[in-house]
Every structure is written in C-alpha cells, then in structure tokens.
Amino acid sequence: MADENYTRITEFIFIGLRYHPNLQVFLFLLFLLFYLVTMTGNLGMIILIRVDSRLHTPMYFFLSHLSFVDICFSSVVAPKMLTDFFADKKAISFLGCVLQQWFFGFFVAIECLLLASMAYDRYVAICNPLLYSVAMSQRLCIQLVIGPYAVGFFNTMTHTTAAFRLPFCGSNIINHFFCDMSPILSLICADIRINKLLVFIVAGAVLIVSSTTIIVSYFHILIAILRIRSAEGRRKAFSTCSSHVTAVSILYGTLFFIYVRPSAISSLDLNKVVSVFYTAVIPMLNPLIYSLRNKEVKSAMGRTVAKAKVFLKN
C-alpha cells in the first residue's frame, strides 16, 4: 500500500509527441487518417469474412478476430492521442490511465498469440493438407482464439496491478502519449526492480512463446515447401504464408525492441517514437497486407461489390 507521506496522484499529464508547432495540423490529420483507415479496413474485413461463405475457413476465422483486436487496440490509444493534439493540458485521470494500460496490455498480448494461432493453422494446411479439415476442427479453432484472450487477461492483470498498487512520487508527468508501462514505472517511488522483472518475464514470455510457435511452424512449412517439386506449387504455398509473415515481422520487430531489450525502461524517448509505429501504423497495415496480398480476399471483395451493385439496381 502507498505511504501516506507520498502525494496522492489523481491524474497524469502526457508530454506527448515532440514536433514543430507548424506540423500540428498536418500530424493530426495524418494520425486521424491512420485511425479512420484502421477502423474501416478492419471492420470491412470482418464484414467481408462474415458475408462471403467461401471465407468461412479457420484461416479467416482467425483473421476476423485479428481485425477485431486491431480495432480495439487502436481505439485504446488513438482517440485520446488525437484530442491531445489541440489540448492545452494533455491530462488523463488516474483511473483512466489504469484502464488504458490494462486494455493496451490485454489487446497486445491477444494479437501476438492470435498470430501464433494463425501460424499453426498455416502449418497444418501446408504440412498436413489431407487432415486439415479434421485437425482444424471448429472446437480447436475456438480454443485457439479463447486461449489468447485468457492469456492476455492474465498478462495485463499481473503487471498492471503490480505497478498501480505502488506509491507514486509528486511528479505526474508521463513521457509518452499514452499510459505505457515503461514511463509509468519511472514515476513510482518504491523499488521497481520486481516490476521491471515482471514486465520482462510476463511480456517476454508472451512474445517468446508466440514467436517460438511461429518460428517452429514456419520451419516445418519451409521444409514442406522445399519438398514440393513444381515451381508453381511452391509459389502457391509461399503466397498463402506471405501476408502472415509480413504482419508478424512488423509487429514482433517493434515489440521486441521496446519491451524485451534490457534498456527498454531507460530509453523512453526512443520507445515513444517506435510506439507510434505499432499503435497507429500496424493496425492500419494488417487489413491492407491481408487484402492486397491475398487472392481469396480480393476475389471475395469483387464478389461482394458485384452483389452490392445488383442489389442497388433492383
């Protein structure tokens, strides 16, 4: 429990992004565009998968959940970030900060583990195609989605509760544009070595377990593809995985850089710059990656547009 001699923090103030005043409107419009594309792209992907029966497969079942998580993940940070561009005081209440950090950690963990579930799905599809429909049963698919939500809940409950139960010093200035764990820990008066270790272990465990699942899956996938004799067969096999590999590489590269490297707590300004990429850009890129590089999605979009035109004519 916090010592009574410590100042009770009722709100936090964000330093936010550092930029030239002349860029204020431009950056606001840019991040607003990112958010709108994120919302429309991911919502469109969910609707497309829902209405097109040919996309009712395990792969697109996982993709629809990934799109849902991207919408939620982006909405945890973007609305507050956008309003702060024109706010004289970039403030957030203590409870608001707790909730923002809680949901942020929740959805980040889910996204990582969903990508691992999708990698396993690709492994079964390419390495055991004859058993695919049996192996990837509806029950297993549901379990591979519920699992990430359960782990995400445990992940965020663990380090968020451990951090916010500690006493904060008089300063309430957060060197970030949202309530991320690293700058929050820098404001705590108590010994935070256990908290740092907890973040490193819990966040690291999620990243390492999910990334190991992905690496092992793609190792077997690569071996299976190299055994395919025809160049056309290898090309088709690679094309089914290329979108997922691209999304994984972008997300995991930034997350490992911020949360797993030992100097993550001290490099707050650098973390803030990199955080822009994975909070604003990655949720926007995922639907673009999976639509522009996926023939099935593009075909489904064409069929849906054609049906819509017929419906409007009638």
Curated annotation (Swiss-Prot):
Spans through the membrane: 26-46, 55-75, 100-120, 134-154, 197-217, 238-258, 272-292
GO cellular component terms listed in the entry, alphabetical order: membrane; plasma membrane
Membrane topology: Multi-pass membrane protein
Domain of life: Eukaryota
Subcellular location: Cell membrane
The keyword Disulfide bond appears for this protein: yes
Cystine pairs: 97-189
Cytoplasmic-side segments: 47-54, 121-133, 218-237, 293-314
GO biological process assignments: G protein-coupled receptor signaling pathway; sensory perception of smell
Chief place where the protein resides: membrane
GO molecular function: G protein-coupled receptor activity; olfactory receptor activity
Extracellular-side segments: 1-25, 76-99, 155-196, 259-271
Annotated keywords: Cell membrane, Disulfide bond, G-protein coupled receptor, Glycoprotein, Membrane, Olfaction, Receptor, Sensory transduction, Transducer, Transmembrane, Transmembrane helix
Any Pfam family the entry gives: 7tm_4
Glycosylation sites: 5
PANTHER family cross-referenced by the UniProt entry: OLFACTORY RECEPTOR
Family membership: Belongs to the G-protein coupled receptor 1 family.
Role this protein plays: Potential odorant receptor.
Entry protein name: Olfactory receptor 5G9
Organism whose genome encodes this protein: Mus musculus
Taxonomic path: Eukaryota, Metazoa, Chordata, Craniata, Vertebrata
